[in-house]
């Protein structure tokens, strides 16, 4: 009886009505529907008896960027985009009525009227905005507050540009492209179209940059810097643009974290109004990917160095009191906390990440995660467990002893196991490769002489010179392991 009353209670059935109705009308009019499962589900939740209606906006508005049309139809009107027989965006679209109208043309006219009005506003700004170049608009950013106490968006742009000038190579980016894109990347905030459609930030910056004479690399970097790394390299952009966009996104996320932590706006368990957790997670994904699958060089900068370089930009501007060492540590700890929470999705264990982070080598994050993944697998092996146990024993012995500054004196060896371990240690030091997998293989090869040492040698000998010499041997051994990680944490 509900269906007799034009009410479909089954959500899946409502979704089926929407899809089937659109497909029927699209086929009859030589159109294809741009698939959007999320929008179908949303519209199904907004209607009781959904009836697709084919509508049409003025063809002149097809000159607008496709993203403007998409946002107008989908985001603002919950309508579906279509393509014509040649695969181009069509000026015909589907609205979904909540009634089986006796006169569908009236429904179509009403929807078209609303869409045409919004597109008319967009066209007005689209035609007017380019009268002022993005470079000329940079000065206007000095009148947009970034955050009270942190200066303006103009100040932020200068920090981003300076960061990219200093660090483009470490970001895997080309300096001229990266610094120019950073300089212009927020200028579209002053345009009428972005004020009307905030979702177009970046997208319109790229469009206006291209029409204003900037290179494709600069324009595409501006358009992409909000979006993160693509899953696959889109040939429409290219590596120079994507690398520059990645560098700007990294600089912006770190800039934001340092600024808000300086103000004391640190997220709590229940509130994160400035999306700082999201900024930290974005940083982890950008820094942690080696990106070779999309043709990019990885980011060759450690987390600590990134924090230092970003703090330098803040401190040079003197907008605030300097970003202190304590604030820098808080930001690092905050990012590391997020990193540990993501361990499973990064295909390694939490303890392996902690072990890798205790290395004496300051590695870029993508290399640190490579080490953590190796350690995760290694810790599951019998050799890995034995080496970890030996490292725990070494760490505990050294922790309870005074720091040893002396070198190892072979003349003080009283046991063959000492000499065997020392010879194996020297050989490992000489052969130690730079690549993490090779380092782990070399260190794992020390298992037998280390085990024999602990079986045959009393480290804490009564003779002071012998005891200190054995502690020096363990100190040197531990230092070698720490070049890779603190395996005692496994």
Cite the ranges covered by each PLM segment.
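Amphipathic alpha-helical "coupling" segments that flank catalytic cores
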Residues: 1-490
